[in-house]
């Protein structure tokens, strides 16, 4: 019984720590999943329309690199 209570308290403490850490780090990851162009442009420096780009770098503010290697 005592061991069960200790385990429950430990799980609750770890859960609380996870929730606090997740709340503090919200919006600070640079390339999490590239969910939106707005988040990408706010977290990194992006290139404007017509600037040279690479499709693998995701560095255009618009989020799209054209066929000719220029931001769209």
Curated annotation (Swiss-Prot):
InterPro entries with a match to the protein in the record: Conotoxin, Conotoxin_omega-typ_CS
Coiled coil location: none
Location of the protein in the cell: Secreted
Modified positions (Cysteine amide) in chain numbering: 71
Primary site of residence: secreted
Signal sequence segment: 1-22
UniProt tissue specificity: Expressed by the venom duct.
Key words, A-Z: Amidation, Calcium channel impairing toxin, Disulfide bond, Ion channel impairing toxin, Knottin, Neurotoxin, Presynaptic neurotoxin, Secreted, Signal, Toxin, Voltage-gated calcium channel impairing toxin
Cellular component terms per the entry's GO annotation: extracellular region; host cell presynaptic membrane
The keyword Disulfide bond belongs to this UniProt entry's keyword annotation: yes
Disulfide-linked positions: 46-61, 53-65, 60-71
Superkingdom of this protein's organism: Eukaryota
Residue ranges of the propeptide: 23-45
PROSITE patterns assigned: OMEGA_CONOTOXIN
GO MF entry, a single one: calcium channel regulator activity
Family affiliation: Belongs to the conotoxin O1 superfamily.
Described purpose of this protein according to its UniProt entry: Omega-conotoxins act at presynaptic membranes, they bind and block voltage-gated calcium channels (Cav). This toxin blocks N-, P- and Q-type calcium channels.
Domains: entry comment: The presence of a 'disulfide through disulfide knot' structurally defines this protein as a knottin. The cysteine framework is VI/VII (C-C-CC-C-C).
Protein name: Omega-conotoxin-like S6.6
Species of origin: Conus striatus (Striated cone)
């Amino acid at each position: 019984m005592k061991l069960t209570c200790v385990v429950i308290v430990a799980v609750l403490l770890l859960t609380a720590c996870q929730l606090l850490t997740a709340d503090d780090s919200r919006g600070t990851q640079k390339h999490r999943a590239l969910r939106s162009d707005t988040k990408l442009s706010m977290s990194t420096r992006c290139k404007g329309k017509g600037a040279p780009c690479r499709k693998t770098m995701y560095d255009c503010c618009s989020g799209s690199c054209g066929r000719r290697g220029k931001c769209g």
